Amino acid sequence: MRRRNLLGAALAAPALLRSGIARANEPVDVELVLAVDVSRSVDPQEQEMQFSGYEAAFRDRRLIEGIMGGPVGAIACQMFTWSNWNIQNIVVPWTRLDSPATAHRFADAIAAAPRRTWLYTSISGAIDFAARQFGQGFEGTRKVVDISGDGVSNSGRPVEDAREEALAQGIVLNGLAVLDLTPLPPLLGSIQPPLDTYYLEEVIGGPGAFLVVAEGFSAFEAAVRRKIIREIAAAPPPGPIIERVA
């Protein structure tokens, strides 16, 4: 009987050991958070263009080659939508991407994600939420937040405060500003800064941070593909801090 008990304890020991020790985070080249604006200014058709653009990007051969081309040969990616200061929804959880199959499954998850529209635009809320997402099972040599939107922040705390806290954590903030080509009313146009200028001065930051400007939602797919390829590059190529896609 004693021998049987000892044998049982020996067999159980590895499981107990595994349960008692925290698993190390899995190494990846980049931890990338995709933060997608779903405020009221993004109408249903434009929102569909956003989701379709991200989906197409993760099916693109060049992007997949970039994912597999780093020292580790993998990235970790998560996607969430945002609007008001307190409204953020994870639509695709953290996923390791290391092959065409995993990238395509990520694209499938984007295609299946729910589409919702909310009221306000809180870029600071999006940054704060994104900053809390890192370190959840992965350890990247770079931590990057990809913020896409079509308007300035009008909800929550100052964007500058959220940005500075994120930068202090070693997070790089890149932007994808989608320009509304409809002329603003004269009064509003005089008090609201151009969106590309706003993102450049108030939103992006960190080593190698850059901004891609989509000239309308019709340019979103090409813009987001170009942006993510640049973000996941093993050694991000030097380039203009602002890049325009028409």
Task: Locate the predicted segments by residue.
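N-terminal export signals
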Residues: 5-23
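Short beta-strand-loop
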Residues: 73-109, 186-200
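C-terminal "exit" segments of structured domains
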Residues: 212-246
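Von Willebrand factor
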Residues: 26-91, 104-143, 145-148, 175-187, 194, ...
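Exposed acidic/Ser/Thr-rich ligand/metal-binding surfaces
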Residues: 120-169, 246
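VWA/integrin I-like adhesion module and closely mimicked acidic/polar interface patches used
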Residues: 152-198
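Second-shell loop/turn segments in exported
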Residues: 35-45, 110-120, 149-153, 189, ...
